[in-house]
Amino acid sequence: MVFSVATSSVTNPKLHHHHHLSDFNRNRVSTSLKIMNSKNHTNPRKCECFDLYDQLIPYKKAWSWQKSILNEKKALIDKNQECSDSLIILQHPSVYTMGTGSSENYLNFDIKNAPFDVYRTERGGEVTYHGPGQLVMYPIINLRNHKMDLHWYLRKLEEVVIRVLSSAFAINASRLDGFTGVWVGNKKMAAIGIRVSKWMTYHGLALNVTTDLTPFNSIVPCGIRNRGVGSVKGLIEDGEHYNKLEDLQLLDIAHESLLKEFSEVFQLQMEKQTVFKLEC
């Protein structure tokens, strides 16, 4: 049994690259770090967290990581063995992704002469953009240990982002009837696109933090016309009491809040893992 649900995401070529390879090497030798929120229940399930939020990881590599983790977990399940949940959080270099049934009619360019790489993936939904300044979360979790309900899972992912925007940035975001994702007015702040196989999830959500939204002009994001995309930085700068924060500060704040709220919403104990484990 395999399900796919429409996805979409968000971008920012403005992100500086000066926090990349040195941090990547540090992650490879870092020790496991536990993140646990006091509001979680007494014995929460463990979730291994591959935290690469300050790095630009090529889409193809992250996609391969997800499928590798997914296959490992499915093999354990087939043997009736327990497996922990997993989460990858990162940024991507500029890239467009499409779902299995995506239409090229939503591309405002010739796919043979695309401005960035274009990947067609297993997820549902239409074309979207990922890029620097957008935090992407890929949960690979066993819904048998949570709730075997795709709508429940989607609403929980939305809840994570709504909480982050409210608690970290005082932004009042909400759901929009008939659409998946998180919105402020008619601006989509976060896109959600998942695939579920044997009740194991992959793909996930993307939150525009300091994202340069220009590349969205080259597509019809998620196939939704007459609605725009937004970013945390853009909304903060438009606010009445704007206090200038550097892009890296905004990303740090959003990252910390995403992990905290994900831990609370899904009642998981986050345990940071080294990148080396992904590449073994």
UniProtKB/Swiss-Prot annotation:
Its main location: plastid. GO terms for molecular function: lipoyl(octanoyl) transferase activity. Expressed in roots, leaves, cauline leaves, stems, siliques and flowers. The active site is at residue 222. GO terms for cellular component: chloroplast. InterPro entries: aa-tRNA-synth_II/BPL/LPL (IPR045864), BPL_LPL_catalytic (IPR004143), Octanoyltransferase (IPR000544), Octanoyltransferase_CS (IPR020605). Its EC number is 2.3.1.181. Belongs to the LipB family. In the reaction, the free carboxyl group of octanoic acid is attached via an amide linkage to the epsilon-amino group of a specific lysine residue of lipoyl domains of lipoate-dependent enzymes. This is Octanoyltransferase LIP2p2, chloroplastic. It comes from Arabidopsis thaliana. The gene is LIP2P2.
